């Protein structure tokens, strides 16, 4: 599933092609996604794109009459293509632009979403989200406060969108390794100093991945069709049995809440 860096990489890739251009119309070939494509999207006509934003893993296209909310689901991608390029099997939604280009949504598993809202504030998919990890609101003091009474392992707690958004499975594993914190540690056992370090490395890991265009393990592609290159820099994720790049100890894989967790028994305590 695309996580925050992948979604942010796509946002940065599509923004220059959309802002200042006008959506002439939408083409919905298959509206049966995780939730049905909103009826308002079918009727889009002559709508200039004012901004392309991101909240958590949602892309937000600002139009004069409202907002398009896009979620990529498990296997979705967005690409900027020439309008004349014919669609393929899993190309479900196009936004045809005034500049001769098309924003094309591809999703083999159809678990993404295209929603419409007049106002973002209070929308049910956005209403209960925690702070952005790259914002000043997410810091060691905040993390320590939220962990203080939490009797659960730190790894799944980091992946809870009510604590902080966008730190999915890959980046939770990578950040805990960078901070030297074992994923099974109770959240409440973390000191303020550990929380300050963890908050810093989460930001650093996410920013580095964004610079590399995200992580491609299977389906993810950037808006130009290229893979994300952060996969080349993964320290623990997906490396079960391989030697730790720091100490040489074999990387261990376990599961938390049915999600794979990777760590080094020597480097993480």
Swiss-Prot record:
<comment type="similarity">
    <text>Belongs to the FPG family.</text>
</comment>
<keyword id="KW-0456">Lyase</keyword>
<dbReference type="GO" id="GO:0140078">
    <property type="term" value="F:class I DNA-(apurinic or apyrimidinic site) endonuclease activity"/>
</dbReference>
<feature type="active site" description="Schiff-base intermediate with DNA">
    <location>
        <position position="2"/>
    </location>
</feature>
<feature type="binding site">
    <location>
        <position position="150"/>
    </location>
    <ligand>
        <name>DNA</name>
    </ligand>
</feature>
<protein>
    <recommendedName>
        <fullName>Formamidopyrimidine-DNA glycosylase</fullName>
        <ecNumber>3.2.2.23</ecNumber>
        <ecNumber>4.2.99.18</ecNumber>
    </recommendedName>
</protein>
<feature type="active site" description="Proton donor; for beta-elimination activity">
    <location>
        <position position="57"/>
    </location>
</feature>
<dbReference type="InterPro" id="IPR010979">
    <property type="entry name" value="Ribosomal_uS13-like_H2TH"/>
</dbReference>
<keyword id="KW-0862">Zinc</keyword>
<dbReference type="InterPro" id="IPR035937">
    <property type="entry name" value="MutM-like_N-ter"/>
</dbReference>
<dbReference type="InterPro" id="IPR015887">
    <property type="entry name" value="DNA_glyclase_Znf_dom_DNA_BS"/>
</dbReference>
<comment type="function">
    <text>Involved in base excision repair of DNA damaged by oxidation or by mutagenic agents. Acts as a DNA glycosylase that recognizes and removes damaged bases. Has a preference for oxidized purines, such as 7,8-dihydro-8-oxoguanine (8-oxoG). Has AP (apurinic/apyrimidinic) lyase activity and introduces nicks in the DNA strand. Cleaves the DNA backbone by beta-delta elimination to generate a single-strand break at the site of the removed base with both 3'- and 5'-phosphates.</text>
</comment>
<dbReference type="Pfam" id="PF01149">
    <property type="entry name" value="Fapy_DNA_glyco"/>
</dbReference>
<keyword id="KW-0863">Zinc-finger</keyword>
<dbReference type="GO" id="GO:0006284">
    <property type="term" value="P:base-excision repair"/>
</dbReference>
<dbReference type="InterPro" id="IPR012319">
    <property type="entry name" value="FPG_cat"/>
</dbReference>
<keyword id="KW-0227">DNA damage</keyword>
<keyword id="KW-0238">DNA-binding</keyword>
<keyword id="KW-0378">Hydrolase</keyword>
<feature type="binding site">
    <location>
        <position position="90"/>
    </location>
    <ligand>
        <name>DNA</name>
    </ligand>
</feature>
<dbReference type="GO" id="GO:0003684">
    <property type="term" value="F:damaged DNA binding"/>
</dbReference>
<dbReference type="InterPro" id="IPR015886">
    <property type="entry name" value="DNA_glyclase/AP_lyase_DNA-bd"/>
</dbReference>
<dbReference type="Pfam" id="PF06831">
    <property type="entry name" value="H2TH"/>
</dbReference>
<dbReference type="InterPro" id="IPR020629">
    <property type="entry name" value="Formamido-pyr_DNA_Glyclase"/>
</dbReference>
<dbReference type="InterPro" id="IPR000214">
    <property type="entry name" value="Znf_DNA_glyclase/AP_lyase"/>
</dbReference>
<keyword id="KW-0479">Metal-binding</keyword>
<keyword id="KW-0326">Glycosidase</keyword>
<dbReference type="GO" id="GO:0008270">
    <property type="term" value="F:zinc ion binding"/>
</dbReference>
<feature type="active site" description="Proton donor; for delta-elimination activity">
    <location>
        <position position="259"/>
    </location>
</feature>
<comment type="subunit">
    <text>Monomer.</text>
</comment>
<dbReference type="InterPro" id="IPR010663">
    <property type="entry name" value="Znf_FPG/IleRS"/>
</dbReference>
<dbReference type="GO" id="GO:0034039">
    <property type="term" value="F:8-oxo-7,8-dihydroguanine DNA N-glycosylase activity"/>
</dbReference>
<keyword id="KW-0511">Multifunctional enzyme</keyword>
<keyword id="KW-0234">DNA repair</keyword>
<feature type="zinc finger region" description="FPG-type">
    <location>
        <begin position="235"/>
        <end position="269"/>
    </location>
</feature>
<dbReference type="Pfam" id="PF06827">
    <property type="entry name" value="zf-FPG_IleRS"/>
</dbReference>
<feature type="binding site">
    <location>
        <position position="109"/>
    </location>
    <ligand>
        <name>DNA</name>
    </ligand>
</feature>
<feature type="active site" description="Proton donor">
    <location>
        <position position="3"/>
    </location>
</feature>
